[in-house]
Amino acid sequence: MTARMEQRFADVAAEGRPVLVTYFMGGDPDFDTSLAIMKALRQAGADIIELGVPFSDPMADGPAIQLAGQRALKAGQSLAKTLELARLFRAEDQRTPIVLMGYYNPIYIYGVERFLADALEAGVDGLIVVDLPPEMDDELCIPALEKGISFIRLATPTTDDRRLPKVLENTSGFVYYVSMTGITGSALPDPSLIAGAVARIKAHTPLPVCVGFGVKTADHARAIGASADGVVVGTAIVNQIASSLTEEGRATEATVPGVEALVRGLAAGVRAARLAAAE
């Protein structure tokens, strides 16, 4: 875990609440608006920012995030430009962890060694690469860890106790528990099932467990955050961005303020939650 990531989790845990992890697609709807959104996320109360890297074949993404990726690619967004977004944000904010989330193909084409060097220089703290299983850790996970960049794994309800230790073996930063199977943006899971799932994962790792997929409102965030170390919100933010755009997919005066207002509400929900361990 990077020092910045570790410090953020420690600071938030001292407040007796979960972290709020916010995701949006880098370059959606354009580069400059994305940078403004990153800044607005932090101002609104995001503790960690997941920055999506657009890819032409996003197999794990729901329709909203697929459309966001298409808008970003159409606007000329690339892995290099996503790293530039991180670098520009980091120049003004030295404390908020940045996690890049995407697929291996753009990184492979970019070059793993070059990518890790540039990510480190840009101030990236962690990676989520959804199509690299633990059996391929030598491709990117191990080199990233050697550079001091966290490699965050996804666990799901179908990740059984035999598979879980393998998934967690080289995981760093936090564990991202996908609270349902399927694609991003599905319906909210039953909060009563979250506590048991988090406890099961924590039996295998000391890492924080953040729960995502389906969180849309402050009430959702509060309910999920009651038993998790973090709440991940993505599709709701992506939908908010999309709803503010012109018919041509361009940003409007409402784009950034709309995201900021949504995330302020989510942050209030998270701040109202209490970790089970503190109750």
UniProtKB/Swiss-Prot annotation:
The active site is at E50 (proton acceptor), D61 (proton acceptor). It is an enzyme of class 4 (lyase). It catalyses: (1S,2R)-1-C-(indol-3-yl)glycerol 3-phosphate + L-serine = D-glyceraldehyde 3-phosphate + L-tryptophan + H2O. Pathway: Amino-acid biosynthesis; L-tryptophan biosynthesis; L-tryptophan from chorismate: step 5/5. Pfam families: Trp_syntA. Keywords: Amino-acid biosynthesis, Aromatic amino acid biosynthesis, Lyase, Tryptophan biosynthesis. It comes from the Bacteria. SUPFAM superfamilies: Ribulose-phoshate binding barrel (SSF51366). One of its GO terms (molecular function) is tryptophan synthase activity. The alpha subunit is responsible for the aldol cleavage of indoleglycerol phosphate to indole and glyceraldehyde 3-phosphate. NCBIfam families: trpA. Tetramer of two alpha and two beta chains. Belongs to the TrpA family. This is Tryptophan synthase alpha chain.
